[in-house]
Amino acid sequence: MTLVDRLRGAVAGMPRRLVVGAAGAALLSGLIGAVGGSATAGAFSRPGLPVEYLQVPSAAMGRDIKVQFQSGGANSPALYLLDGMRAQDDFNGWDINTPAFEWYNQSGISVAMPVGGQSSFYSDWYKPACGKAGCTTYKWETFLTSELPQYLSAQKQVKPTGSGVVGLSMAGSSALILAAYHPDQFVYAGSLSALLDPSQGMGPSLIGLAMGDAGGYKAADMWGPKEDPAWARNDPSLQVGKLVANNTRIWVYCGNGKPSDLGGDNLPAKFLEGFVRTSNLKFQDAYNGAGGHNAVWNFDANGTHDWPYWGAQLQAMKPDLQSVLGATPGAGPATAAATNAGNGQGT
């Protein structure tokens, strides 16, 4: 019996309210990682791109953090691409599942893909992040807003401010929160298929289930109990006023759970996208209500919780990113042997 069959059987005959809650809990707890999440065609960029594998010191986390990096040229702006809940420790999901480095080669934008951070929400946790693999320190916000930009500025001639940040699923809300609290660094934030009201309703409980499944982590170690102010602090729908006041350029995408020819025609991918769509519409209402006028909204007539849709959005936003960040297309090394290459599949 497949995972999807077990899910169908478990909810058969249940009242609709309980079906939605149970299915949402199951899917948000990581089943998408097991039965969905197909890669974009041509995943991993072609060999010969100037991609480097950096080991960036982090005093906040007490270790070096691997960052996949492609230069956009001297004094170029940066684009930080953040991974999903099941982020791996070998490569960033954007590289595993899409040819993102190839798409942005010669774009005038330096691309930085931090590696790791499973279930982290790219946040500074209250407590050590203890999971199935042991305990570590998660201070991702500090790393992304202080340590990494300082390193890239000093070592790679990347502008430390005026950057963009784009995340999918878990990291979509993270991208908006990073921009809300660090407006000089992140003038552009993209959220793709994210839950944008995580502190509200069943959000804390579902996130706790998801983190438990994706690595065995505890949400309370991250932001405390659901009544803790950290939950509201990291809720984009409650911090939308900051994005409006900052005049941050935002790009928000969410499908409706109906697959297109891009793929993702499986129950978890379809259900999860439909599940998070409501929070995206709610966020749009809050943004407009706060007087926001610097947003791109892509609420498509199709789209499931899957990489081909996120890859299409990253390609679509490229001209907008270049314009907002002031990139100079054509800047940066055209081709080079990858530094410390490790995946043998292109980067």
Swiss-Prot record:
GO cellular component: cytoplasm; extracellular region
Reactions mediated catalytically: an acyl-CoA + a 1,2-diacyl-sn-glycerol = a triacyl-sn-glycerol + CoA; 2 alpha,alpha'-trehalose 6-mycolate = alpha,alpha'-trehalose 6,6'-bismycolate + alpha,alpha-trehalose
Superkingdom of source: Bacteria
Start and end residues of each stretch annotated as Disordered: 326-347
Transmembrane segments: none
Coiled coil feature spans: none
GO MF term list: diacylglycerol O-acyltransferase activity; trehalose O-mycolyltransferase activity
Residues given in the record as substrate binding sites: M85, R86, S169, D197, F275, V276, R277, T278, K282, H305, D306, W307
Residue numbers annotated as active site: S169 (nucleophile), E273, H305
Stretches the record annotates as Fibronectin-binding: 101-111
Signal peptide feature range: 1-43
Disulfide bridges in this chain: C130-C135
PANTHER family to which the protein is assigned, alphabetical: DIACYLGLYCEROL ACYLTRANSFERASE_MYCOLYLTRANSFERASE AG85A (PTHR48098:SF1), ENTEROCHELIN ESTERASE-RELATED (PTHR48098)
Chain's role: The antigen 85 proteins (FbpA, FbpB, FbpC) are responsible for the high affinity of mycobacteria for fibronectin, a large adhesive glycoprotein, which facilitates the attachment of M.tuberculosis to murine alveolar macrophages (AMs). They also help to maintain the integrity of the cell wall by catalyzing the transfer of mycolic acids to cell wall arabinogalactan, and through the synthesis of alpha,alpha-trehalose dimycolate (TDM, cord factor).
Family, per entry: Belongs to the mycobacterial A85 antigen family.
Name by which UniProt lists this protein: Diacylglycerol acyltransferase/mycolyltransferase Ag85A
Species classification: Bacteria, Bacillati, Actinomycetota, Actinomycetes, Mycobacteriales
